[in-house]
């Protein structure tokens, strides 16, 4: 049986995406040239979604995917780019420097504020007449048909029913769609929370990112345009709750004690945000006519800024699997096809989840052998170029299978 795209005159869709955030829109944008009819179901009004005061580390691979989607040119002048990374540890006197030359790239990574990247992706998908938005709308339930899922939404007090050959959960770590599907997760909550905020500073150089490890948790400093920096400060829950509620002057004093004078004079330019840290992996990423992407499938420790990047890779990989199946006349919602996505992404995500968990535990340990071992490890990274390059390729996404979108090729069904 050959599966063809749905007509554009009814509530029948080829792909319905629950969640119109960055990951869901990467998937939709990746499919926009395939001829498939796509529904995006988003609970937040557009104005509210675009006010999220958050910034993300964007890896080299994610940047290449965004370029393949055609949105990079629209955001590259509005985001931060870092050419160097300095890694340091409380129990190590020096720093381990990484540079763009270590991977022969123009930068080591990028930093994008949520409204910038989300608006660019929204503009991209809104140009496609075969993509329909249901917003604000909530997915209430879904049932399985022979070759489709029937999805019930609530929008403006009324219920709407859609049919789709594939439902994709891109609705975050507390995914309602995943819960309705009965998919269990494994993982744990860390003993830490993160305090995230943005500062304005006077450092002469704004092209260096910093990752500072200590026994209470890591701190990441990421450069933003306009002499700004996004800081994610990880620490035990009680300390994080105390810091987020300190008067601003006292908070600045605590921060200066941690980062020293590397950024010169600085001040806060937005509110401090507190969020807990967890590791989570779904037992499965797919069921017949259902797939999970992004935080709906997995969550990791924020050290290294990997979370959103894993989701962007999920979206690009699933788009490729769907487009390939469609071009070959296969049922892109079948379990056999969707397993190709799971077999691609789940092991790679496990690798990063395990690596970030190891980093946090290893650099937080007071055990003397662990302290000695991490000193040795940092020396190896500093002095052995192949080890440095391998670590960089892992954290920038350049190690492993790359989605077609990352090569600059659009996904077009034949």
Curated annotation (Swiss-Prot):
Keyword Transcription regulation set for record: no
Superkingdom as given in the UniProt entry: Bacteria
InterPro entries in UniProt: FAD-bd (IPR002938), FAD/NAD-bd_sf (IPR036188), Ubi_Hdrlase_CS (IPR018168), UbiH/COQ6 (IPR010971), UbiH/COQ6_monooxygenase (IPR051205)
Keyword terms: FAD, Flavoprotein, Monooxygenase, Oxidoreductase
Coiled coil: none
Listed cofactors: FAD
One family name in Pfam for this protein: FAD_binding_3
Molecular function GO terms recorded: FAD binding; monooxygenase activity; oxidoreductase activity, acting on paired donors, with incorporation or reduction of molecular oxygen
GO biological process: ubiquinone biosynthetic process
PROSITE patterns: UBIH
Annotated NCBIfam families: PRK07364.1, Ubi-OHases
Family membership noted in the UniProt record: Belongs to the UbiH/COQ6 family.
PANTHER family with a match to the protein in the record: UBIQUINONE BIOSYNTHESIS MONOOXYGENASE COQ6, MITOCHONDRIAL
Protein name according to UniProt: Uncharacterized protein slr1300
């Amino acid at each position: 049986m050959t599966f063809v795209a749905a007509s554009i005159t009814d509530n029948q869709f080829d792909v319905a995406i629950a969640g119109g955030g960055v990951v869901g829109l990467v998937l939709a944008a990746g499919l926009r040239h395939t001829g498939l009819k796509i529904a995006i179901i988003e609970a937040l009004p557009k104005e509210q979604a675009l006010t999220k005061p958050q910034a993300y580390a964007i890896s080299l691979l994610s940047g290449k995917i965004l370029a393949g989607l055609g949105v990079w040119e629209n955001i590259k002048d509005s985001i931060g780019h870092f050419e160097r990374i300095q890694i340091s540890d409380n129990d190590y006197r020096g720093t381990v420097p990484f540079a763009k030359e270590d991977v022969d790239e123009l930068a080591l990574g990028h930093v994008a504020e949520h409204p910038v990247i989300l608006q660019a992706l929204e503009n991209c998908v809104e140009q496609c007449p075969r993509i329909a938005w249901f917003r604000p709308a909530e997915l209430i339930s879904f049932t399985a048909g022979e070759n489709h899922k029937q999805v019930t939404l609530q929008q403006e007090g009324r219920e709407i029913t859609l049919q789709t050959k594939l439902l994709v959960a891109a609705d975050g770590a507390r995914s309602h769609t995943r819960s309705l599907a009965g998919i269990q997760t494994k993982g744990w909550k860390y003993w830490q929370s993160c305090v995230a905020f943005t500062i304005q500073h006077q450092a002469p150089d704004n092209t260096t990112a910093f990752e500072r490890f200590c026994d209470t948790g890591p701190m990441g400093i990421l450069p933003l345009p306009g002499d700004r920096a996004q800081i994610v400060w990880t620490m035990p829950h009680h300390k994080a709750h105390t810091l987020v509620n300190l008067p601003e002057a006292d908070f600045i004093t605590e921060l200066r004690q941690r980062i020293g004078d590397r950024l010169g004079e600085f001040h806060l330019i937005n509110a401090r945000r507190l969020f807990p840290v967890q590791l989570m992996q779904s037992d499965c990423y797919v069921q017949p006519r259902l797939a999970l992407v992004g935080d709906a499938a997995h969550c990791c420790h924020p050290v290294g800024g990997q979370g959103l990047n894993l989701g962007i890779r999920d979206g690009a990989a699933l788009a490729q699997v769907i487009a390939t199946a469609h071009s070959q006349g296969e049922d892109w919602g079948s379990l056999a096809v969707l397993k190709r996505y799971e077999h691609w992404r789940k092991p790679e995500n496990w690798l990063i989840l395990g690596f970030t968990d190891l980093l946090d535990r290893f650099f937080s340990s007071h055990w003397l052998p662990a302290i000695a071992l991490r000193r040795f490890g940092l020396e190896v990274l500093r002095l052995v170029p192949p080890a440095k390059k391998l670590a960089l390729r892992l954290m920038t996404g350049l190690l492993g299978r790359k989605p077609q979108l990352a090569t600059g090729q659009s996904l077009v069904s034949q």
